[in-house]
Amino acid sequence: MASKIHNGILILTLILFASCRTQKPAPRPAPPETVDFPTANIPLPVMDFNFMLPETPELAVCHSPRKDITEAFTPRDKSQIAIKDPKLFDENNTEIIDLSLIPSGEYAFPLPKGNVISPYGGRRRHHSGVDIKTCANDTIVSAFDGIVRMAKPFAAYGNVIVVRHYNGLETIYSHNSKNLVKPGDRVLAGQPIALTGRTGRATTEHLHFETRINGVHFNPNIVFNMAKRKLRSKCLVCTQKGNNVIVKSVDILPHQKAGPYVPPP
C-alpha cells in the first residue's frame, strides 16, 4: 500500500515538472506611446520678480571735454595771436585733451574740401601751421565750438581769426579775403567764419591753419588727419615747461581716464 502511494506521488511530481518546463511565460503588454497625466487646476502664485533684476542703466550722453577757459577778452587779447589763458595750467603743469570724447557733430575740418599744400614745420623756415587750398573765396568753418577772440588784419597773417575753444585749444585761420565774425561771437563747429583769400604774406588763395594751446603753436596733424580730414581719436598730453608747452599725442586706456594722468619722467 505504501509503495503504491509512493509511486503515485512520484508520477504526480513528474507530471507537474514536465508541465512547468513546457509552459511559456505570458507576454507583457507594450508600454503606451504617450502617458496621460491627470489634470489639476492648481493656481500658481502671482509674483513680480523684477525686484530681483538690476535697474536698466541709462545710456551715457557723450559730450566734448570742456575746460574752464577765459571768455572775457582784453584789448590786448583781441589784437595778438599768441596769448596765454590764465585759467590753463593754473593747478599743475599738465592739461589733457581727450579727442576721442568729441562727438562727430562737434568738430569740423576747417576747409571741408581742401588739400594740404604746405605742412607744419619745414627745413628753410619754421612753418607754424599748415596751408590748405581749394579755391578763392571758399568757406572756412570753425573746427570746434568756441568764442572768437581776435578778428582783424595782422601783419603777415593778413585777415586773421582766432577762436578760443572750450576744450582748451585755440585755432587760427588766416589770409582770409573776408572775415565773417567779430571778437566775442560764439561759434559752433562747422559754422562759416571766413572766406579763403591771399591777404598778408601769401602767393595764392589758401587757408593758413594753426592749432595752439596757451599761445604756443603745435602740429595740427596731431589733432586732424589731414589726408582724411578727420579728427584723430587720440589724447593730447600738454605739458608746460617754462614759457613753452610740449604737446604729445598718446593712446589712453579706459582705466587711465578715471584718475589723473602722471606723465612719464
Positions of predicted regions on the chain:
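Catalytic cores of peptidoglycan-degrading enzymes
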Residues: 103-237, 243
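Polar/charged, compositionally biased leader and regulatory segments
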Residues: 2, 20-119, 230-265
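Bacterial N-terminal signal peptides
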Residues: 9-17
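Bacterial N-terminal signal peptides that target proteins for export
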Residues: 1-9
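Intrinsically disordered, low-complexity regions enriched for glutamine and histidine
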Residues: 4, 21, 204-206
